[in-house]
Amino acid sequence: MTLRASSPATVPAALRQRRKEARPKELLDAALDLFVEKGFAATRSEEVASRAGVSKGTLYLYYPSKEELLKEVIRHNVVNQISEGMEIVRAFEGTSSELLAYVLRLWWERVGETRASGILKLMMSEVRNFPEIAQFWVAEVTSPADRMIAEIVQRGIDSGEFRPVDVENAVHALVAPLLFLVMNKHSLDACHVGAKFEPKAVIEAQIDLVLHGLQTAAGAAPARPAKARAPRKSNGGRR
């Protein structure tokens, strides 16, 4: 007996619709994997389409250029996480120490230890050659993320829990170790060379050092793991 593949006309309409709805995410997943594996400049659009199981023409129906595809990869995997982070910050009812510790831990869970972390490595290694992407990254990722951390620090200062530090530079001091963890993950650690350490343990050490530097004598207290209800993780954080 000869088995023939179903033609599009014989595939149930509901199934075709589900496939169509899933296609943008499939393209974004394929693009993320290839951009991180090969680099943005070295990845061809037809490679993304092939990995997603569609034609190059279908890819362009959703994303008219490779640059627009990368922007959507960033939105899906990183920008959405920052938006959810801001919701958490503004709804949080605990101390600023607890909030800061919670956000640092959550960042590693949602971005640092997921495949989305490869985007940060990609930006650092290639963005100088793509000024439009650089502007997009600053506007959609760097600036909002910095504002979120600054809001937490300022919250602590206003309540008297934190010392009146330079907020802008405090933000840089908080973010830099997180970027180091990502770069190490995608460089030396990927080659199984260099010092071995547990990123979550490093983040706990960072929390301890930072809070002891920020807190006033009256505000000093251990930052217990917070029990805030965070928004559901977006699909971009797939491990």
Predicted regions and their residues:
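A conserved beta-strand->loop->alpha-helix hinge within the catalytic CA
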Residues: E47, G94-L99, D166, E198
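Amphipathic alpha-helical linker/stalk segments
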Residues: K71-V103, E109-V111, R115, I119, ...
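Short secondary-structure transition hinges
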Residues: S83, E109-E151, V193-K196
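Membrane-interface starts of transmembrane alpha-helices
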Residues: R163, V167-V171
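Amphipathic, non-transmembrane alpha-helical scaffold segments
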Residues: K20, L28, I74, A134-D146, ...
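C-terminal peripheral helix-coil segments that are non-catalytic and often amphipathic
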Residues: M1-A14, E98, Y102-L106, S143, ...
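Short amphipathic alpha-helical segment with a characteristic S/N-K-E followed by hydrophobic residues
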Residues: L27, A42, S65-L70, N80, ...
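Basic, helix-initiating cap at the start of DNA-binding domains
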Residues: M1-K38, A42-V54, L61-E68
